[in-house]
Amino acid sequence: MTRREVREHTFRALFQKEFYNSEEYPEQYQRYLEDPVFSEDTDAAAQMDDATREYLTGRVASIAEKLPELDEKINAVARGWKTNRMGKVEVSLLRLATYEILYDEEIPEKVAINEAVELAKRYGTDDSSSFVNGILGELVKKQ
């Protein structure tokens, strides 16, 4: 599975988290892992193996653990917006990309931003990609 596919699954897990409380989410996440929805771009043979599931679970847990800090960083640069007022797609992508920018040294900032923008084009509204790009650009400038 490519990094892009893992990133998309991470986004989907974070997006899913927005709809469930802390008691319900673990069960829903397990269901997702048992039968992940693959995109039309994904080769059907590229099924999620155990190592990928483990990596994905660790990554989602690490991001979830840092949500208050990630939201604080996003809120500091999102003029006129707070994460609690943003769309679920946008906030999930912003959290993922902010995590990658701040904590994942293997992913260049430009790659994190570009991938978030591409996912915003795919899953968000017409304005999502520019919204995500603008906030992440400000975040990188201010750090």
Question: Can you annotate each of these PLM segments?
Answer:
Residues M1-S129, N133-Q143:
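N-terminal interaction/assembly modules
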